[in-house]
Amino acid sequence: MKASLLNKLDILQDRFEELTALLGDGEVISDQTKFRAYSKEYAELEPVVQGYKKLLGVQGDLEGAQALLKDSDPDMREMAVEEVREAKELLITLESDLQRMLLPKDPNDGRNVFLEIRAGTGGDEAAIFSGDLFRMYSRYAERRGWRVEILSENEGEHGGYKEVIARIEGDNVYGKLKFESGAHRVQRVPATESQGRIHTSACTVAVLPEPDEREAIEINPADLRVDTYRSSGAGGQHVNTTDSAIRITHIPTGTVVECQEERSQHKNRARAMAWLSAKLNDQQTAAAANAIASERKLLVGSGDRSERIRTYNFAQGRVTDHRVNLTLYSLDEILAGGVEAVIEPLLAEYQADQLAAIGE
């Protein structure tokens, strides 16, 4: 293991011992804010420190076994050879585990997200496919116990959505969905196609982490134009008869957000402001993320909205993710909410990329 990583582990071990003492301090125990913060840090460091102690123990065993290789007793030397082999194999595993634990954590992974799906090329068929994608993510959210709340929708003439915006709330939502941003392409025979010809359509997906209120970008009210209008409901008793829908324009950037799903104008405005904050934050971080991705030639992680990331081929029952050359012949299961089968290989590839960067 690199000396820099061993040095970092020594520092973390010292901090862990410091936290152990702090959590037994009466003043800290009486201050619940400090106690919770220290307890969280302790819980995060504990598996790392335990792994490091085990690593040091195995290193000691290896040194002892290597010393026995010079023993005059041939039986002892034979036993030492086996112990050296086992210790070296275990060290490789322990070092790999510790490197993974030391990978930088994305502070946004635990956040809720705003999911934007927009129909691109393909007209009505693209809108229908937008609906398919939204159902896929909604069913995946159900499987994980997340809550999905539509903020704004513009339905297609023949079904689906020209655009749909939703907020997804739950555990580790961004951590799971962050690599879904990009262009999703569908190849299939549209229901309106009489000749049976396969058409290609596309939709764009954007996944934006919801900023923490304490970290949200400060927005000058003078930079905003707020318009109200009547929600374009589907009809019936829930159609708004008041101007409860909200459209907010951030004048310096031209960014526009709308929220029309709540019957309360106040709630729609609060949702729209949260979404606007997420979009402005995304604009600030996108350039830096793209620069890092370009410099390190990341296979995944740039989040470029225009990048074609995945193809759904109905004739072959195939889903292909172009970033990691992953092809699965389980399209129906994936669209039914089984998108984890695509997400997990992407996360594994990203982790492998981070590990490679540590070794550079």
UniProtKB/Swiss-Prot annotation:
The modification N5-methylglutamine is found at residue 237. Methylated by PrmC. Methylation increases the termination efficiency of RF1. Pfam families: PCRF, RF-1. It is found in: Cytoplasm. It comes from the Bacteria. GO terms for molecular function: translation release factor activity, codon specific. One of its GO terms (cellular component) is cytoplasm. Gene3D superfamilies: 3.30.160.20, 3.30.70.1660, 6.10.140.1950. Its main location: cytoplasm. Keywords: Cytoplasm, Methylation, Protein biosynthesis. The keyword Cytoplasm applies. The keyword Oxidoreductase does not apply. Peptide chain release factor 1 directs the termination of translation in response to the peptide chain termination codons UAG and UAA. Belongs to the prokaryotic/mitochondrial release factor family. This is Peptide chain release factor 1.
